[in-house]
Design a protein with these regions (language model features):
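General small-molecule cofactor/ligand-binding pocket signal
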Residues: 4-6, 79, 101
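Short low-complexity stretches enriched in small and charged residues
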Residues: 1-5, 33, 55, 108
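A charged, well-structured terminal subsegment
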Residues: 100-115
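Amphipathic alpha-helical interaction surfaces in cytosolic regulatory modules
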Residues: 22-98
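Short beta-strand/loop segment at the start of cytosolic alpha/beta domains
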Residues: 1-15
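Conserved catalytic submotifs in the C-terminal HATPase_c
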Residues: 8, 49, 105
Length: 115
């Protein structure tokens, strides 16, 4: 699994590739919390378009990122979920907790500051 961060205007996109499972979900959690809590980024989008598989520990990392963002009044969105990842979130009844977008354009539009 690989994680990289890039800044687009007022938001940070974390690009994740590979599987998110028990062996590496702490890395995802750390990257999310680094952006939200340490760097104070108020708009974070997690790009899951290159993620093949996510297990319950990966879902827990996403929930922790969501909780941290809500605690600090930040926005945290997901985009690019494949059918498998979407189904994992749906079965766990967590899909409705997240703002989920099909692609980066939609996610960035949702995070754009209102004028």
């Amino acid at each position: 699994m690989k994680i990289s961060a890039r800044r687009i205007k007022t938001a940070t996109i974390l690009d994740v590739s590979g599987n998110i499972d028990m062996s590496n979900s702490p890395e995802v959690r750390k990257a999310l919390l680094q952006e939200i809590r340490v760097k104070g980024v108020t708009r974070v989008a997690l790009n899951l378009s290159a993620v093949n598989y996510i297990d319950s520990s990966g879902v827990a990392s996403l929930v922790e990122g969501l909780k941290a963002s809500r605690d600090l009044g930040s926005r945290f969105v997901l985009f690019g979920l494949n059918d498998s990842a979407r189904e994992v979130l749906k079965i766990s009844r967590l899909l409705k907790l997240f703002e989920v977008y099909d692609d980066e354009i939609q996610a960035m539009a949702s995070l754009a500051p209102s004028v």
